[in-house]
Swiss-Prot record:
Protein name: Cation/H(+) antiporter 7
GO BP terms in the entry: potassium ion transport; proton transmembrane transport
Similarity annotation: Belongs to the monovalent cation:proton antiporter 2 (CPA2) transporter (TC 2.A.37) family. CHX (TC 2.A.37.4) subfamily.
Record InterPro entries: Cation/H_exchanger_TM (IPR006153), CPA2_transporter (IPR050794), Na+/solute_symporter_sf (IPR038770)
Main function: May operate as a cation/H(+) antiporter.
Pfam families: CHX17_2nd (PF23256), CHX17_C (PF23259), Na_H_Exchanger (PF00999)
Entry's transmembrane regions: 58-78, 83-103, 128-148, 154-174, 192-212, 223-243, 254-274, 287-307, 312-332, 340-360, 377-397, 407-427, 438-458
Keyword Transmembrane helix attributed: yes
Amino acid sequence: MDPFNASWWTNMAWHGYSLSEDGTKFCEMLPTKINSFGLSEKILHKSVGLYFWEYPLPNLELIILSVFFFWQFFEILFKMSNIPIPKMPSMMLGCVVINLFSYTRPGSLLHRMFFPDDGRPKVAETGGAFGFVMYWFLKGVSIDVGMLRKTEPRAALIGFNTLVIPYISGYILMRTRKHFGKLAMTELQYQEIILLQSLSSFAGVNGLLTDLKINHSEFGRMVQSCAAVTDLVIFIMVSGTVLLKGQKGLPHGIVIVLVIGFLVYIVWPVMLWIIKQTPEGRLVKDVYIYLVMATAYFVYMFWLNFFQFSTYGWFIIGLATPAGPPLGSALIQRFECFNVGVLLPLFGSLSMEQLDISWLMREILNLKHMEGFAYEAISVILIVTVVKFVVTAITAFAVRIPYRDSIVLAMVLSNRSIFELGYLGYIVELKMFDNKSFTIAALSVLVSSLLTPIAIEFMYEPQHIFSSYRDRNMLTLKHDSKLKTLVCIHKPDHITSMVNFVELFNPTQESKLECNVLHLVELIGQAIPTFISHKMQKPKVGTRSCSRNVITAFLSLRRHLTKEAISIDIFTSASLVEHMHEDLCWLALDKNVALVVLPFHRSWSVDRSTIVSDDKAMQNLNHKVLKRASCSVGIFVYRKPLWESQMHGSCYKVCAIVVGGKDDKEALAFTNRMRRNKQTSVTILHLIPQLTTEESEDSVQKLDYDDIKEIMKTEDSNENDSWICIEKSVKEGAETSVILRSIAYDYDLFIVGRSSGMNSAVTKGLNEWTEFEELGALGDVIASKEFPSRASVLVLQQQQY
């Protein structure tokens, strides 16, 4: 570079930088010129002036605006067409369009705007790269690591097969082609493409499921567990390769152990300490946010120097951050909006700028001859993807996952995502891929991310989002198993009723109880939804928690019972009414509960003459939970203290009313669990419908004495006389009503199945008068204000899915 060259000084004066004639040297003034002198610069000084977009700041603003425009164009287009495409494919499509317009004429205005080759730092690309690593960090923050500890053997088998078998198949294909002819691709390119198509990134899978809003379902947890296994296998393979590299192997192995120890014994305890220092309902202090971000940057730089693909450093720190409020939610609320709205679109779009569309159009002509670079790349991608899909679906179906879910699971694990796009950019930087390899691989990512969500939307049944692959009900619970329940509280009036209800179980060392209490608080206005675990967060000294009465009541209950026999966890969920059932169902799914207990929405005065409260929002919530819960559900109609009879020295009297059907069997199983309390007297009223000429024995619900006896038996003795069974033959609903009224004052609690007696003579004529569908015909009769006594009622529905 000649410092005495007039053009060199002219460029430095006007442009702020200069490039040598041979393009090997670049010089820039400091401080850097980032702002334009205005639109008139190029007009007044045509020979030396710059267009405003050639300055760094206007150029960055122009790129951000253009990327946002194209992203939103495709986003709105897909939404208007009811096509469930996530954000990332829309971002990628935006840059493909820009790329096509730019390369139609080499050196065109668009090309100089978006892809300038002036040697200056690429600010937009740098911002996009930061958005990518920040996305990984926030994705790690949003993931509940506790879910990974619950990985089932079948998830491990699926995860192992979905990685190893496709990888081996691709490797065999490469060796076969090499044996029979010359490869157009290098072995390294083959290996990277095969690896990329074989793995299923945990973060990518989680992102897809989150976009489709099924990440918290039982299906979503299963798929994420499978993806976590594939990541673990990849980590073991990479670590094993590093350890076998002679002298560097041992130091790297020691570093891996130190990193794991640092995360487990330092970072994780510090995160928990931050949570405990934050009073419930309060925001996390800024200094703690800065501390977490500084730690993430430190681990990122550490990973950059010792390992490959340093983005994992941010992701691991994200995983080490407890999900949910207060810390995880604070990080997401603070950074996600700007990152997803501004920085990440730059990555999703500009990462596609290396596409060589013109080469691809020429190479397509060779596909019909089954030769050439594009043919080899496309064929290996298709073959490995098909093998992966088939192996995953067959393995899932073999371990008793429903056929439809097995297909969807294979689709999700075969999907390509932002992770694969980032990894492609990484290996291009390492010169392991050229533009041709990147073009084929990146377009395969785009096609996969466009088609997979559409196929999943077509195959997956969203109404089963909270369905479970395991039995979660009272009937299948083993005699000595711990009973896991979730009791819900809306109003202060419900505290006493739910405490009384939990006391019914009388937990012992042989009959343990895990009680999860969820206090549902309705949000008004624009408040932010929160979810608080009172085991993790404590109220600040001098303040009062909105759930203080709930906490005090249940902790007092725990002190009066055997501590080893009962465990109580209390949560508060503050959300909009229309979303309350989602928090409830997700918590039930996460805690693996067998029974959810909901309070009835209506309450009466002591003499039952007036309605004290009638909450329609609560009634709608109960309906939604009954339809979508992953376990059995009970609706508790509380009308008097359950232990009132004991105050007078008598036993607590329970009557289970059964006709037939699975809900009645669930009611019997619940009654059998209560029978372990020696202060409880149990009676079973078996209503037997008389068959009409139009009915057959197979068309009505049926339950004989042997079935009842089988459910009510205990491990202690085959014959147990601590319960009695009364059988009544019924012709119609009016006769059923008379029988129920005749025993109204004999019992303190009635237990009935929600579907008990449906479509039989027992409820004939009653269904037309049923006021509350959620209680069923028999439950509605007992809970009505016309019923003579104030006995409480529990209506049970067995697990639906």
